[in-house]
């Protein structure tokens, strides 16, 4: 497995594989890899001859400097895991390599609508940072396929729109959420949880599934349902951040034409911001 830190060397390897007629898959990550990331690598391996994994903690998508500073950097361990999983190349650039002129003068990519709604409304600039780094990676790697986790539901929708709007010839694959046995979605940020908080964390998943059951039973009093869930989260020790039930295809409020809903949840538990989502078929 190759470990590369510069775009020049990355392009050289990509060019060689292209000349050999290889199909290339990209798995963008911010490192601190867990089993959820490994399922992305497995999916990429099933769809391509070459698997490239990027490991880059992207400063442009952090709105809080303290959050950026404490995000875990575990490159050596990440590379060991990726080597065992069969990745072909790890691209691990520094911020100075990706943004040589600094963030203030960096050209950016913005996806109208999706960048500023829902999570984007409370995290200004976050999705601009996501769209910009993903675009840079797409330009550097020029993959045939790219794999992203469905845990970041709005991010996945944004990347799909980016690909459509910019004309990238890339298949975007959403990979289902990987969960612990108690339902908690695997996340690099779960490491921020204390032992006591880790015991409480699955409550987020449990309340999400309770909302799913209400939708299955025909309840459409969305605001009331979300208010009750927020109160239950507070009683359990969480600080609710974002709770939405939206059309799974458009991320707009549900209407009579909606056939699928998505429950989007984010809440703070101690120093960890936990996110999760679940899709519900409304036609049953």
UniProtKB/Swiss-Prot annotation:
Compartment(s) where it occurs, according to its Swiss-Prot or TrEMBL record: Cytoplasm
Entry EC no(s): 6.3.2.1
Domain of life according to the entry: Bacteria
One term of GO molecular function: pantoate-beta-alanine ligase activity
Record keyword Ligase present: yes
Binding site for (R)-pantoate: 61, 155
Binding site for ATP: 30-37, 149-152, 178, 186-189
A Pfam family the protein falls into: Pantoate_ligase
Pathway(s) of this molecule: Cofactor biosynthesis; (R)-pantothenate biosynthesis; (R)-pantothenate from (R)-pantoate and beta-alanine: step 1/1
CDD domains according to UniProt: PanC
Self-association state and partner proteins as the record states: Homodimer.
Described purpose of this protein according to its UniProt entry: Catalyzes the condensation of pantoate with beta-alanine in an ATP-dependent reaction via a pantoyl-adenylate intermediate.
Protein name: Pantothenate synthetase
Species this protein is from: Pectobacterium carotovorum subsp. carotovorum (strain PC1)
């Amino acid at each position: 497995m190759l470990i590369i830190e510069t775009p020049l060397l990355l392009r050289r390897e990509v060019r060689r594989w292209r000349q050999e007629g290889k199909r290339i898959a990209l798995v963008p990550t911010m490192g601190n890899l867990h089993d959820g990331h490994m399922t992305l690598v497995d999916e990429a391996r099933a769809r391509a001859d070459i698997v490239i994994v990027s490991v880059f903690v992207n400063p442009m998508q952090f709105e809080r400097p303290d959050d950026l500073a404490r995000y875990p950097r575990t490159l050596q361990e990440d590379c060991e895991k990726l080597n065992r999983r069969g990745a072909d190349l790890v691209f691990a650039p520094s911020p100075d390599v990706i943004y040589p002129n600094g963030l203030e003068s960096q050209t950016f990519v913005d996806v109208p609508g999706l960048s500023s709604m829902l999570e984007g409304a409370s995290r200004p600039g976050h999705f601009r940072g996501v769209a910009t780094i993903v675009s840079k990676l797409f330009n550097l790697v020029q993959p045939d396929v790219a794999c992203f986790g469905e845990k970041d539901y709005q991010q996945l929708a944004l990347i799909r729109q980016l690909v459509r709007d910019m004309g990238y010839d890339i298949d975007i694959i959403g990979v289902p959420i990987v969960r612990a046995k108690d339902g908690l979605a695997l996340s690099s940020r779960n490491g921020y949880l204390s032992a006591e908080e880790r015991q409480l964390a699955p409550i987020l998943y449990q309340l999400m599934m309770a909302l799913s059951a209400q939708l299955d039973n025909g309840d459409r009093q969305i605001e009331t349902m979300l208010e009750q869930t927020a109160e239950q989260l507070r009683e359990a020790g969480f600080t609710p951040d974002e709770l939405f039930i939206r059309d799974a295809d458009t991320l707009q409020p549900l209407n009579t034409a909606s056939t699928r809903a998505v429950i989007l949840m984010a809440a703070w538990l101690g120093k960890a911001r936990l996110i999760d989502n679940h899709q519900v078929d409304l036609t049953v």
